[in-house]
Swiss-Prot record:
Function (record text): Displays alpha (N-terminal) acetyltransferase activity. Catalyzes the covalent attachment of an acetyl moiety from acetyl-CoA to the free alpha-amino group at the N-terminus of a protein.
Protein's organism: Sulfurisphaera tokodaii (strain DSM 16993 / JCM 10545 / NBRC 100140 / 7)
Residues noted as binding substrate in the record, renumbered to the chain: Y37, Y154
SUPFAM superfamilies xrefs: Acyl-CoA N-acyltransferases (Nat)
Protein name: N-alpha-acetyltransferase
Protein location: Cytoplasm
Domain of life: Archaea
Catalytic activity line of the entry: N-terminal L-alanyl-[protein] + acetyl-CoA = N-terminal N(alpha)-acetyl-L-alanyl-[protein] + CoA + H(+); N-terminal L-seryl-[protein] + acetyl-CoA = N-terminal N(alpha)-acetyl-L-seryl-[protein] + CoA + H(+); N-terminal L-methionyl-L-leucyl-[protein] + acetyl-CoA = N-terminal N(alpha)-acetyl-L-methionyl-L-leucyl-[protein] + CoA + H(+); N-terminal L-methionyl-L-glutamyl-[protein] + acetyl-CoA = N-terminal N(alpha)-acetyl-L-methionyl-L-glutamyl-[protein] + CoA + H(+)
Catalytic activity, EC: 2.3.1.255, 2.3.1.258
Binding site for acetyl-CoA: I92, A93, V94, R100, L101, G102, I103, G104, T105, N132, Y139, K140, K141
Sites marked Plays an important role in substrate specificity: E35
Membership in a protein family: Belongs to the acetyltransferase family. ARD1 subfamily.
Length: 167
């Protein structure tokens, strides 16, 4: 899957991630987020969930990514305890100078589409810092709802919202 879009004079392209992208994905992860993962973690997720793992390119340079996983678990959306197949956005990041161009939205939409169409997931969820208003607003725009607060979720003690959306 691949598509290009332009906003504010910048054209970007969304495509499936490749193993050759992992070094740049790790660089983006380190620059953009306090939650960092080892090399093998990215490689394993890419190998296992390749169809829903996307990167964004500007002028041939990877500037953002979304790393998912697919799992079985209790629904975050249904009232009764129901076992469902769901997508989990493990990590999503865009380099600071490329934010507010729609790249995060495009990455999420591409991954969510693959979660549903390729992996037959019924819903998607993620964790987000309660202080990360831009991300929370983006997720709400895409249909996510705050399900619950995860107290002291992050290593620095900050709480997270668990947010979920139907696919």
């Amino acid at each position: 899957m691949e598509f290009a879009e332009a906003k504010k004079g910048k054209e970007y392209r969304i495509r499936n991630a490749r193993l050759t992208d992992v070094d740049q994905i790790i660089k983006i992860n380190r620059l953009a987020l306090p939650e960092n993962y080892p090399y093998y973690f990215f490689v394993e997720h890419l190998k296992e969930y390749e169809a829903a793992f996307f990167v964004a390119e500007v002028d041939g340079e990877v500037v953002g990514y979304i790393m998912p996983r697919i799992e079985w678990g209790f629904s975050n959306l249904k009232q009764l305890p129901t076992l469902v197949k769901k997508g989990h956005v493990v990590s999503i990041a865009v380099l600071e100078q490329y934010r507010r161009l729609g790249i995060g939205t495009a990455l999420l939409q591409a991954s969510m589409k693959a979660m549903k169409e390729v992996y037959n997931a019924e819903e998607v969820y993620l964790e987000v810092r309660v202080s990360n208003s831009p991300a929370i607003n983006l997720y709400k725009k895409l249909g996510f709802k705050e399900v619950k607060v995860l107290r002291h979720y992050y290593a620095d003690g900050e709480d997270a919202y668990l947010m979920a959306a139907p696919l």
